[in-house]
Swiss-Prot record:
Catalytic activity: (1S,2R)-1-C-(indol-3-yl)glycerol 3-phosphate + L-serine = D-glyceraldehyde 3-phosphate + L-tryptophan + H2O
A GO molecular function held by the record: tryptophan synthase activity
GO cellular component: cytosol
Entry protein name: Tryptophan synthase alpha chain
EC number(s) given by UniProt: 4.2.1.20
Encoding gene (name): trpA
Keyword Lyase: yes
Family annotation (CDD domains): Tryptophan_synthase_alpha (cd04724)
Amino acid sequence: MISVSDCFESLRNNSSQCALIPFITAGDPDLETTAKALEVLDRSGANMIELGVPYSDPLADGPVIQAAATRSLNRGTTLESVLEVVQTVSPKLRSPIILFTYYNPILYRGVENFLKKIYDVGARGLVVPDLPLEEADILLEPAKDIGIELTLLVAPTSPKERIKAIAHQSQGFIYLVSVTGVTGMRAQMQTRVEDLLAQMREVTDKPIGVGFGISQPEQALQVKKWGSDAVIVGSAVVKRLAEGSPDEGLKAIGEFCQNLKAAIN
């Protein structure tokens, strides 16, 4: 399985293409559909895929992803069952899987045990939205040793010195949160994102991915034009997958992913 860094390097060497990173919640509507969705996204233009592990107190998630997590947990989804899906599907994918999970489940299982397990099943990246920079060392070093790239988040309110510190520590890429607040679909992208991207370019040459609020191909293109190396789309994908039957949802996310990819390429 290719690493997140290698994926970005390949894209940069190929006419500086912008990466598409869709997000889905594992277990919504069920784990069988999650497995199929990973394959659909992989062949529909995704360069990497974020897979959200459902959690009972998802502080960073907006209403669409919160509802998906609740449905998934109510069906009995656990971290272990999610990792079984990753283990089954990851060998079939060209896109590396980035797990999105909160810190408490990691702490509960033990940092090294968790990291080794997710690496062994095929995940290559990790995003922990409630892990502050000041506590990131507990994950960064063991993750690096094991082969998991821990991506840190930059908030739109972050001062320049903090951006610099996060950029220095983040692995794989840097996740720029486009709006204050939780995930979710927005009608317009804030022009503040353009300024933040410019600020970040002054302190790092690492890839930057923009997420939270992108719901339309036109917004994805705008973010690319502002200089982002990746576009991360979550709620709009989760919403489409949840609507109608599982087969209808899979068809919808495949078409949406293709439209997003066409816009940014």
